[in-house]
């Protein structure tokens, strides 16, 4: 069984999906502070930026 590598398109799609999930969680949290969630969102934004994705277009 060989190791399959992920294409850039697959990586971008998975990372966008992750960002969308985190945004939905943040939105459903209301005004409750969640530092771990905020940090996860920041990391995901950094990854998407590195991959050339403009997150302003996909932010809730």
Model region roles, listed by residue range:
Residues 1-20:
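Short, charge/polar-rich alpha-helical segments
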Residues 14-60:
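Short, charge-rich amphipathic interface segments used for partner binding and complex assembly
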């Amino acid at each position: 069984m060989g190791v399959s590598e992920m294409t850039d398109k697959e990586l971008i799609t998975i990372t966008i999906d992750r960002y969308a999930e985190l945004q939905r969680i943040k939105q459903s949290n209301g005004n409750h502070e969640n530092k771990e969630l905020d940090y996860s969102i920041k990391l995901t934004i950094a990854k998407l930026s590195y991959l050339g994705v403009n997150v302003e277009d996909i932010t809730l």
